[in-house]
């Protein structure tokens, strides 16, 4: 994954974990998706591991679209005396809110049962709880 090239402020305060997503709650591009059921942080290493596992399991059966991008920097000061500043950005993370669609699967050539197995396998790698969502003929979203 890429890191942000340029930001106005790279050293941010930590975000509020109580909020709930109101905008990205439905599937837009694909038939299947992974929805977050709790709020939490995803670090860049965790994102890479999840992406690699999904690509390995799905192979060429469908395209994967990730709805997140690491925008916030996590700083690490190290060992220094007081008053030396905040520290440099050591890694990047993204805030995933409860109810947001995190991953969408496009052009699916798999059944719902096979897709559930893949998502259950990858759900163990996530630092937050996730579940699978499915859209039926573009009309409504079904919880699985």
Swiss-Prot record:
Primary localization: mitochondrion
A Pfam family annotated for this UniProt entry: Ribosomal_L16
Location in the cell: Mitochondrion
Organism in which the protein naturally occurs: Dictyostelium discoideum (Social amoeba)
Protein family: Belongs to the universal ribosomal protein uL16 family.
Keywords, ordered alphabetically: Mitochondrion, Ribonucleoprotein, Ribosomal protein
Biological processes, Gene Ontology terms: mitochondrial translation
Domain of life: Eukaryota
A molecular function (GO) term: structural constituent of ribosome
Name of the protein: Large ribosomal subunit protein uL16m
GO cellular component terms attached to this protein's record: mitochondrial large ribosomal subunit
Signal peptide: none
Lineage per the UniProt record: Eukaryota, Amoebozoa, Evosea, Eumycetozoa, Dictyostelia
Coiled coil regions in record: none
